[in-house]
Amino acid sequence: MDLNIKSLAGQEAGSLGVAEGVFAADYNEALIHQVVVAYMAGARQGTKAQKTRSEVSGGGAKPWRQKGTGRARAGTIRSPIFRKGGVTFAAKPKSYKQKVNRKMYSGAVKSILSELLRLGRMTIVEELKLETPKTREFKSVIDSLGVKDVLFVVGVEEFSENLYLSSRNLKNVAVCDSVEINPVSLVCFENVVLTKKAIKEIEEKLV
């Protein structure tokens, strides 16, 4: 299938043949949801930690004798019922990672890309290159393309410090290379702009 290419000025600049297996896949909302949830769960640190009664310091001596005081029996002042005692159900470090195999992951990315294309939220440009790190220049490119809340995806060799510096101060705008795209970044932005080289690299990875 052929897709139209735009120049950075927003003008038609030819067409590009793309793989239907990547950009014309069926929309699978359940798969996308599962992969996105798994991806975000894997990003959690899970470093919460509290101490149980066996881990807090102190409490070696019996606070008072077993019988005759009229008080409830106690064996240590580090019991959870005492101040400075251990936590009853202490939180421990935990991994939230969920297993997602390669076929599911690539299927979700294909489904998202195809749906973005069907909804008219995908734009393809010849290349994305800035000679100087100027936010004003990058903003003019965005305005010319008529997009907002946008993710720019470029080829690995096309990604440069100028692109990063020019875009980092713009709200709801991000730039990444084709290796860094993931289901979460694709669904978080309303629009996506890809260069020709980025499309070829994505196809090589997903086909």
Swiss-Prot record:
The keyword rRNA-binding applies. GO terms for cellular component: ribonucleoprotein complex; ribosome. Keywords: Ribonucleoprotein, Ribosomal protein, RNA-binding, rRNA-binding. One of its GO terms (molecular function) is rRNA binding. One of its GO terms (biological process) is translation. One of the primary rRNA binding proteins, this protein initially binds near the 5'-end of the 23S rRNA. It is important during the early stages of 50S assembly. It makes multiple contacts with different domains of the 23S rRNA in the assembled 50S subunit and ribosome. Residues 48-70 are annotated as: Disordered. The keyword Ribonucleoprotein applies. Pfam families: Ribosomal_L4. Belongs to the universal ribosomal protein uL4 family. This is Large ribosomal subunit protein uL4. Part of the 50S ribosomal subunit.
